[in-house]
Amino acid sequence: MKGAPHMAEKLTPREKGFSEWYVDLVQKAKLADYSDVKGCMVIRPNGYALWENMQRVLDKMFKDLGHKNAYFPLLIPESYLKKEAEHVEGFNPQLAVVTHAGGSKLEEPYVIRPTSETIINRSFAKWIQSYRDLPLLLNQWANVMRWEMRTRLFLRTTEFLWQEGHTCHETEEDAEKETRQMLEVYRTFAEDYMAMPVMTGQKSESERFAGALRTYSIEAMMQDKKALQAGTSHNLGQNFAKAFDTQFQGRDGKMHHVWQTSWGVSTRLIGGLIMTHSDDAGLIVPPKLAATHVVIIPIFGKASDAEKAQVLEKTNALAADLRKAGLGVVLDDDDTKSPGFKYNEHELIGTCLRIELGPKDLAKNSCVMVRRDVRQKEFVSLDEAVSKAQAMLDAMQKDLFTKAKSFRDSHTFEVNSYEELKEKADQGFLLAHWNLDPKVEARIKEETGLTTRCRPFDLKQEPGKCVVTGEPSPGRIVFSKAY
């Protein structure tokens, strides 16, 4: 075809370089790009569409549980962060500070939001007077900034998009219930929508959020067997409430500090989705989060003008029927591109299902359907095209989860000695006994590159001996190399 574009660029194979494959995919699938601002990325429309769908699902899940959206300032007075000593110490190396504005030096510097516990507590202290004002359940969709030295698109950037939930409660029990409930929301979202199996559990003291009593996380395994912390939920206790004097008059008539939680997920989830499912041909997106479910590609070959018109009429009608069924559809009738180019292009950008239709298919009242994940042709009657497309997308969603879970489970091991831990350091999730000593944890990280991920809730915990020191251990914790 004269003037036709060349075949889509190939990605670095995962086996040759997983990191290079990932960067290739993100850029060539037009998900994100580098910017001239150090450590900051440009999220392109293909990537932002994924984030919008994640937002849509999560926002409904939050609101169904009674949370309401609000928005707080990007700039936080530096003194606010200093009110909670552990919090400012934990974030200090990552802070971006504004010292000048309007042509002059500020009396007090502002910190660009790394997270919003401090400034939100300032408002909570004004809004909450009585136990009748509780629980207070808020969520914020925002951008945050944490100065990162080593960045990677979606996974670790200086500026990123996220949601952060902030809640206040009467009792410690209520706060703990909320913390665990929101972790379960994240697990449900990761598994039911992202088709990404996760372990849920409690983080170690060194991995705990600065200023929290306890931190819980969801941990996923990527195809290179590294862990990705995909979401966190924190029981803040009364630490921030005491720092900002966030009190309420209780049912006993006395003043009490509120009990608080915070929880969040970010655009890092997009990186997790990519590394869980995608292949050497490009992006694979679980249908529940896809912006485009179906691409219809007319196949003309040596068809006459009349035959082309018939094919286009049918493909337009089919596209309309699929859209009525609630699917995102693209009709790719660009005659400057060959069918082969279009196949590669839509595999690269992660379109879930391809439908091919030419004059010969039309004569048989059939079409060809190809699922993105298995890439096998299936001949389908046009009378059943809509129901078959929906069934294939449902099957794809389930199969992606099953495949990812099988991969994770086959790379999860119990280890019973330090030698075994070191030998299996690159093999996935390692369940090992540890004595809870942060110094031992730091030694393991330095000598093996392994970090503690979480103490899984669904693992029956039995006492044992620390694999490093032989000292008593209350149970096994997941060690893994991680992003």
Swiss-Prot record:
Keywords annotated in UniProt: Aminoacyl-tRNA synthetase, ATP-binding, Cytoplasm, Ligase, Nucleotide-binding, Protein biosynthesis
EC number: 6.1.1.15
Enzymatic reactions: tRNA(Pro) + L-proline + ATP = L-prolyl-tRNA(Pro) + AMP + diphosphate
Classification via Pfam families: HGTP_anticodon, ProRS-C_1, tRNA-synt_2b
GO terms for cellular component: aminoacyl-tRNA synthetase multienzyme complex; cytoplasm
InterPro entries xref list: aa-tRNA-synt_IIb, aa-tRNA-synth_II, aa-tRNA-synth_II/BPL/LPL, Anticodon-bd, Anticodon-bd_dom_sf, Pro-tRNA-ligase_IIa, Pro-tRNA-ligase_IIa_arc-type, Pro-tRNA_ligase_II_C
Gene Ontology MF terms: ATP binding; proline-tRNA ligase activity
Localization of this protein: Cytoplasm
GO BP annotations, alphabetical order: prolyl-tRNA aminoacylation
Subunit structure: Homodimer.
Its biological purpose: Catalyzes the attachment of proline to tRNA(Pro) in a two-step reaction: proline is first activated by ATP to form Pro-AMP and then transferred to the acceptor end of tRNA(Pro).
NCBIfam families associated with the record: proS_fam_I
HAMAP family: Pro_tRNA_synth_type3
Family: Belongs to the class-II aminoacyl-tRNA synthetase family. ProS type 3 subfamily.
UniProt remark on domains: Consists of three domains: the N-terminal catalytic domain, the anticodon-binding domain and the C-terminal extension.
PANTHER family tied to this protein: BIFUNCTIONAL GLUTAMATE_PROLINE--TRNA LIGASE, PROLYL-TRNA SYNTHETASE
Record-given protein name: Proline--tRNA ligase
Recorded name of the encoding gene: proS
